Amino acid sequence: AYLKWAQDRGHNITSTKVYEEELLPETVEGIDFLIVMGGPQSPDEDRQAFPYYDPEAEIAFMQKAIAADIYIVGVCLGAQLLSVAYGGNYEHSPEREIGVFPVTLTEAGLADEHVKGFGKTLNTGHWHGDMPGLTYNAVVLATSQGCPRQIVRFSPKHYAFQAHLEFDPKAIDLLIAADGEEYLRKQNKELPFVQTPEQLRANDYSEMNKKLYDFLDSLTQA
């Protein structure tokens, strides 16, 4: 839904598919909004398993964007990398979460001009085992039963989303295929916040997509 929002709003879009070994730009010149998405890795992943993945390069690029004070939204792994770019240390989430579960806004979240539109609680997507670290200036805006850091604000222009408001049926099918249906069923039996493939496909993702659009519109019009 992030890409669709940018297309719908008529933005000029460039992308770097690091999983296809595309190189990051040398500068952030010409970029006014950086969205860093997720992946199966952690910020300190052993590169032998993912030779294309260079977290140090991604973090350095994000630090350039921070210094330039452009808009940044990090999603899942991108949220964790943003926290490291700010000097924090990512951490393992208390619970692994896969599926749709509610996030609850904190008092700070209810007061945040861009996030408060989510309401007190919002059903969002999840597919993670880690979470962003915190720094002295970080503000937790939303939590869930399984993870205390679902949305974190690092500055008025820089937000970390551990939750996936962008999920849609196509993305879910790709994620199920990547993890495997039997693996997910096994995880569902062993862990409290993992849904079955059938549950994942039955979820309605439209409301969270709408709320994501509202957030992105609010952020970029501030």
Regions found by a protein language model. Give the residues of each.
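Catalytic nucleophile loop
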Residues: 65-89
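Soluble or luminal CAZymes and related metallo-dependent hydrolases
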Residues: 53-57, 144, 204-212
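Acyltransferase
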Residues: 166-222
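Pocket-forming structural segment of enzyme catalytic cores
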Residues: 86-170
